[in-house]
A protein has these predicted regions:
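A short, hydrophobic C-terminal helix/tail in secreted or cell-surface proteins
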Residues: 188-189
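N-terminal segments that mediate ammonia production and transfer
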Residues: 2-136, 144-184
């Protein structure tokens, strides 16, 4: 419906039917996977691979897909002009896992390219390029490759601390980062 606004990828499921929808601008990803005769929906292609499934395709911006025992149906009545579509850059540089593919773009490759572009636009005189785990590591590798500055590790991420930038207060974000990241000490190449 045109009443549904904003950025979304949603899935509704019952014992007999599963429905997936993606916002008309394509801001949030949603993809279709299949294993044997079972379809499933996921926000990232890596989730499909993790359960032994085969990536079928991305749900297109503005598309609603439905699955029953009779197969898949597609409704594109909410689709808009592709020139008006947009992607959320945060999906490629932060949210998505590096082993995902979103709208035919390999996330790992996108981060390498972003790091190389950053090195071209903002060269620096430095001894070492380091990234902030996890999403910044690959971009740092791209920066290193383009600039010729060695790449190394300087931080360890506490895997048990969730996303820090979404905390409601700056003081909470700052204290969460202190718990989340530890210096390795002397950075090594």
């Amino acid at each position: 419906s045109s009443d549904l606004q904003g950025a979304y990828a949603l899935v509704v499921s019952s014992p007999r039917k599963m429905i997936g929808a993606r916002d008309p601008f394509g801001l949030k990803p949603l993809c279709i996977g299949k294993r044997d005769n079972t379809y499933f929906l996921a926000s990232e292609s890596c989730a499909i691979a993790a359960v032994g499934g085969e990536f079928v395709r991305d749900v297109e911006p503005g598309e609603i897909v439905s699955f029953t025992k009779h197969g898949m149906k597609s409704d594109k009545t909410m689709a808009i002009d592709p020139n008006k579509q947009a992607r959320c850059i945060f999906e490629y540089i932060y949210f998505a896992r590096m082993d995902s593919v979103i709208d035919d773009v390999n996330v790992y490759h996108a981060r390498i390219v972003a790091g190389k572009a950053l090195a071209e636009s903002y060269p620096v005189d430095a001894d070492l390029v380091v990234g902030v785990p996890d999403s910044g590591l690959v971009a740092a590798k791209g920066y290193s490759e383009q600039s010729g500055i060695p790449y190394g590790m300087a931080f360890h991420k506490n895997s048990y601390v969730g996303r820090t930038f979404i905390k409601p207060k700056q003081s909470q974000r700052e204290s969460s980062v202190k718990i989340k990241l530890n210096e390795i000490g002397r950075a090594h190449v």
